[in-house]
């Protein structure tokens, strides 16, 4: 029998469930606090980590020096006629990384907390504090200030739509909000509904001497503040720096108000890919035990010499937990952004990866696929001889051919240099990634670890431990949860076959959705189990493998089910596909792929097919039928090479004109597809594909 990574801790309640299981190392008792820690609140945990770190560098960030604009005119077919469209590209000039020690983080945490209390935000849960901002060092410092005063934080994605933002602000009766200067204009309408907001803090001073973008940043922020004052003259407005200064001057006047374990720490709003955002209620006890669970699976693998690059939304539980894990390891937490990760969108400076040189990087499938395709595009530009050398080295490493370490290091050196040259682990979480993509990164860069969890469980479920590495699974149960599978009869998954819906229980599992008893009753059992909505299976080693989200399993005309996310992860690995939404109509046999094409590789492909000439803009050929059909054939070849068969093979594809971003409403901030919105935009074209295949 193979080594077991989880163990049964009791008997199955009935024939429709598996026995509950835990990580084999916590069979007797799941963790409620991190190893070697006595903390039971986030404030105690932060203080413990920061004191241990002392004068070591603990946090790093870059400032925006300038934003450069480049305009480009493209020609598109609109209603059968050529139309010129002007597009603007932005390029960021960034400062070198600035550092702050762990000791300084203690000072900032306390100064910010005292400043918040001094301006009028009440501690110990009397007031709630809303954060509507992009990931940055100031986001985290505001959060730390709040927990030092026992002020619950409400998080919302910085790309949350107006209705969702109003919903989260009004429902929680938040008294204060922190936002980015660039988001101030988005606050004007919500603040007219959210009457409980009395304090607004913005992340940068509004300085008339700010000449970035020819003064546009200053003017936009100033105009937004003036309009906010018009509609809400009662709101007190401060910059981040002003609040810290107020706190520094109030050391002898304002006391700290540390929270208790059962106190509310955070209401984290989901991104709402289908329904209205739900507020997940998380206590200090929940989050600290969640940090314990995730940390348990990577304990000893990551430490104080590591540098973690942070760029995912901090409103996402996955990112929040891993930033606190970085504090726990006493490594350096460095902030970046998707826009400045590589040299592609920077000017007069290096991208975050090369500048910061991370050893650990956390990402989601959409980001990793973009990185992989950029690498593959560079490889395709090499001479045929160099391409052959690259793929020969790849094949030898994949097959573990002895004595090829030096060769692979030399061949893959440039790829590693492009990501800073020091990565030892990368992690994917939030959505499924294809085995091909996981294998590619693990061979040419470093091992890709898979993590799986939910907001409701503080990102706790599974983390693939480095010494248990295997492709295609989400890994070992973390150290703080108990898991079981239950039958999903209508979809044909049964516990007796070690398959079913995953239910989780333990200290990280929240108890409710904020002011939402109906959703709470649907998702939580009377005895504390959380229904994840994910269909999974136990592997022979006691690890977990995800089949798909229950809501993403669609029955087709012939009565068989297809797993949408599984198909998307495979088709997305094709070099011509930047993103894809697989749509399955229950009245049809096969699905259709709605594809955002990858412009670089597609341009070369179109030239190779003699559909366009070298130097022409691919956007003018997006709707060329011959090009679309050629890409479709390539996608089917990709699918077959990765084991897709029958109804998993698309019957056709349509091309989408623009990239899907949180800003245009086609994906959430966590890069999850908004399927309804995507389908609505190309419904007639999807119907055309079905008609052509009927």
Swiss-Prot record:
Compartment(s) where it occurs, according to its Swiss-Prot or TrEMBL record: Cell membrane
* Molecular functions (GO terms): ATP binding; long-chain fatty acid-CoA ligase activity; very long-chain fatty acid-CoA ligase activity
Q: Which residues carry this modification: N-acetylserine?
A: 2
Instruction: Locate the transmembrane regions by residue number.
Output: none
Temperature optimum or stability note = Optimum temperature is 25 degrees Celsius.
Comment on pH dependence = Optimum pH is 7.7.
EC number per UniProt: 6.2.1.3
Q: Provide the binding site for ATP.
A: 269-280
Reactions catalysed according to its record: a long-chain fatty acid + ATP + CoA = a long-chain fatty acyl-CoA + AMP + diphosphate; (9Z)-octadecenoate + ATP + CoA = (9Z)-octadecenoyl-CoA + AMP + diphosphate; hexadecanoate + ATP + CoA = hexadecanoyl-CoA + AMP + diphosphate; (9Z)-hexadecenoate + ATP + CoA = (9Z)-hexadecenoyl-CoA + AMP + diphosphate
**GO cellular component terms listed in the entry, alphabetical order:** endoplasmic reticulum; lipid droplet; plasma membrane
The sequence motif named FACS is recorded at 527-576
Cofactor(s) the protein needs:
Mg(2+)
What keyword terms does UniProt attach to this protein?
Acetylation, ATP-binding, Cell membrane, Fatty acid metabolism, Ligase, Lipid metabolism, Magnesium, Membrane, Nucleotide-binding
- Gene Ontology terms: biological process: long-chain fatty acid metabolic process; long-chain fatty-acyl-CoA metabolic process
Main localization, broad class:
membrane
Q: Pfam families of this UniProt entry?
A: AMP-binding
Q: Where is this region: Disordered?
A: 1-25
How does this protein assemble? Interacts with FRK1.
Family the UniProt entry places it in: Belongs to the ATP-dependent AMP-binding enzyme family.
Explain the purpose of this protein.
Activates endogenous long-chain fatty acids (LCFA) by esterification of the fatty acids into metabolically active CoA-thioesters for subsequent degradation or incorporation into phospholipids. Acts preferentially on C16 and C18 fatty acids with a cis-double bond at C-9-C-10.
Any notes on this protein's domains?
A: The FACS motif is required for catalytic activity and substrate specificity.
Which PANTHER family does this one have? ACYL-COA SYNTHETASE LONG-CHAIN, ISOFORM J, LONG-CHAIN-FATTY-ACID--COA LIGASE
Q: What is this protein called?
A: Long-chain-fatty-acid--CoA ligase 3
Q: Which organism is it from?
A: Saccharomyces cerevisiae (strain ATCC 204508 / S288c) (Baker's yeast)
């Amino acid at each position: 029998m193979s080594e077991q990574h989880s163990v049964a801790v009791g008997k199955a309640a009935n024939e429709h469930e598996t026995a509950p299981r835990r990580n084999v190392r916590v069979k007797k008792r799941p963790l409620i606090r991190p190893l070697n820690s006595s903390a039971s609140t986030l404030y105690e945990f932060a203080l413990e980590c920061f004191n241990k770190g002392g004068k070591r560098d603990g946090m790093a960030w870059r400032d925006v020096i300038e934003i450069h604009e480049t305009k480009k005119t493209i020609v598109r077919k609109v209603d059968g006629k050529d139309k010129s469209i002007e597009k603007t590209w932005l390029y960021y000039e960034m400062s070198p990384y600035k550092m702050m020690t762990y000791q300084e983080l203690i000072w900032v945490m306390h100064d910010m907390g005292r400043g918040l209390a001094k301006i009028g935000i009440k501690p110990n849960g009397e007031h709630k504090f809303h954060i509507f901002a992009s990931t940055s060092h100031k986001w985290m410092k505001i959060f730390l200030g709040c927990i030092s005063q026992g002020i619950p934080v409400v998080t919302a994605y910085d790309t949350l739509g107006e209705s969702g933002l109003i919903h989260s602000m009004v429902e929680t009766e938040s008294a204060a909000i922190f936002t980015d200067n660039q988001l101030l204009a988005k606050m004007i309408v919500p603040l007219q509904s959210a009457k409980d907001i009395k304090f607004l803090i913005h992340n940068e001073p509004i300085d008339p001497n700010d000449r970035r973008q020819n003064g546009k940043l200053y003017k936009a922020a100033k105009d937004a503040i003036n309009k906010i004052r018009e509609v809400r003259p009662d709101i007190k407005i401060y910059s981040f720096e002003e609040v810290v200064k107020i706190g520094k001057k109030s050391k002898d006047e304002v006391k700290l108000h540390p929270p208790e374990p059962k106190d509310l720490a955070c209401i984290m709003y989901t991104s709402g890919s289908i329904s209205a955002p739900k507020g997940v209620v998380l206590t200090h006890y929940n989050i600290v035990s969640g940090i314990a669970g995730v940390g348990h699976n990577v304990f000893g693998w990551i430490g104080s010499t590591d540098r973690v690059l942070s760029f995912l939304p901090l409103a996402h539980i996955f990112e929040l937990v891993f930033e606190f894990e970085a504090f726990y390891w006493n490594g350096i937490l460095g902030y970046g952004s998707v826009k400045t990760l590589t040299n592609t969108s920077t000017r007069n400076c290096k991208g975050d990866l090369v500048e910061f040189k991370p050893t650990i990087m956390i990402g989601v499938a959409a980001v990793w696929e973009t990185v992989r395709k950029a690498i593959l595009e560079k490889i395709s530009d090499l001479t045929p001889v160099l391409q052959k050398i690259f793929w020969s080295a790849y094949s030898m490493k994949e097959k573990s051919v002895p004595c090829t370490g030096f060769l692979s290091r030399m061949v893959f050196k440039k790829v590693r240099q492009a990501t800073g040259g020091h990565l030892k682990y990368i992690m994917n979480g939030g959505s499924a990634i294809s085995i091909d993509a996981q294998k590619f990164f693990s061979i040419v860069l470093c091992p890709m670890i898979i993590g799986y969890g939910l907001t409701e469980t503080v990102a706790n479920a599974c983390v693939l431990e480095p010494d248990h590495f295997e492709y295609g699974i989400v890994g070992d149960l973390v150290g703080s949860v108990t898991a079981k599978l239950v039958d999903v009869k209508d979809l044909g998954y049964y516990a007796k076959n070690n398959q079913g819906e995953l239910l989780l229980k333990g200290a990280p599992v929240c108890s409710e959705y904020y002011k939402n008893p109906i959703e709470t009753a649907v998702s939580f059992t009377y005895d504390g189990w959380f229904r994840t909505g994910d269909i999974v299976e136990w592997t022979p080693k006691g690890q977990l493998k995800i089949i798909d989200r229950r809501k993403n399993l669609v029955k087709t005309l012939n009565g068989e089910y297809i797993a949408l996310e599984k198909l998307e992860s495979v088709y997305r690995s094709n070099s011509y596909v930047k993103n894809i939404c697989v749509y399955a109509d229950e009245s049809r046999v096969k699905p259709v792929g709605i594809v955002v094409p990858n412009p670089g590789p597609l341009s070369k492909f179109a030239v190779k097919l003699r559909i366009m000439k070298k130097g022409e803009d691919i956007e003018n050929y997006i709707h060329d039928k011959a090009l679309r059909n050629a890409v479709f054939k390539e996608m089917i070849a990709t699918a077959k090479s990765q084991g897709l068969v029958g109804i998993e093979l698309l019957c056709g594809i349509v091309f989408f004109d623009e990239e899907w971003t949180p800003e245009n409403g086609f994906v959430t901030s966590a890069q999850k597809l908004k399927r309804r919105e995507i389908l609505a935009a190309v419904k007639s074209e999807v119907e055309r594909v079905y008609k052509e295949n009927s």
